[in-house]
Swiss-Prot record:
Organism name: Rickettsia africae (strain ESF-5)
Residue positions binding phosphate: 86, 124-126
UniProt similarity note: Belongs to the RNase PH family.
Its EC number(s): 2.7.7.56
Protein name: Ribonuclease PH
Length: 239
């Protein structure tokens, strides 16, 4: 039995608040249990040097955690003078994931920057960031099309992400911090809207895990992603 009382295939309570930031083209505050992440999408009329003159755009991402987002204060990376390896890994993951669901050729020479700021961390911050970032990106594209900055919708697919793990010998969905810190296996799954995989991250913390255990986690993750896609559609269609 999970300490939270949740079933093995049960997500934490989820909410998606649209457009909490008034200046970004698109923004979303995602809450999954006690993990809260502010996601925004901002358009700039510049592209990285390697894309100049090619009439296509780019999507990149930045990720950070507020000092008070965890039980012990995190030092600001700006004050330290450099980003940590975990931060770089996560923001590259978010950028890669977003580029899989948008046709950058339809952006023209524009760059969309996804910003993910963790307000409260209780496990699954990177997966929450991806799920919330899609909503922010969708709203940004909608805004750019309404302003006629973009003539064609470049979005190809939805995207959502969720964590799974092996905890006390059982495959479970959407780990909170206590589960994650004591899990035998910790994994993250990123899905496109059609159920195809965009990225899988999986690590054995203690002992190697079997193919059977991996498939059990994959099954749970697909079910969780389906719920996330449904919620994304509900809030976006209602806005």
């Amino acid at each position: 039995m999970r300490q939270s009382g949740r079933k093995s295939n049960q997500l934490r309570p989820i909410s998606l608040e649209l457009s909490p930031l008034i200046n970004a083209e698109g923004s979303c505050l995602i809450k999954i249990g006690n993990t809260h992440v502010m996601c925004s999408a901002t358009c700039e009329t510049t592209v990285p040097p390697f894309l100049r003159g090619q009439n296509q755009g780019w999507i990149t991402a930045e990720y950070g955690m507020l000092p008070g987002s965890t039980s012990q204060r995190i030092k600001r990376e700006a004050a330290l003078g450099k980003q940590g390896g975990r931060t770089q890994e996560i923001q590259r993951l978010i950028g890669r994931a977003m580029r899989c669901v948008i046709d950058v050729r339809k952006l023209g020479e524009r760059q969309i920057i996804i910003d993910c700021d963790v307000i409260n961390a209780d496990g699954g911050t990177r997966t929450a960031a991806i799920t919330g970032s899609y909503v922010a990106l969708h709203l940004a594209i909608r805004s750019l099309m309404k302003k006629r900055v973009l003539k064609v919708n470049p979005l190809i697919s939805q995207i959502a992400a969720i964590s799974c793990g092996i905890y006390k010998g059982e495959a479970i969905l959407d780990l909170d911090y206590l589960e994650d810190s004591d899990a035998d296996v910790d994994s993250n799954f990123v899905f496109a809207g059609n159920g195809n995989l965009i990225e899988v991250q999986g690590t054995a913390e203690k002992n190697p895990f079997s193919e059977e255990q991996f498939l059990a986690m994959l099954k749970l993750a697909k079910g969780g992603a389906a719920e996330l896609f449904k919620l994304q559609n509900q809030v976006l269609l209602g806005s």
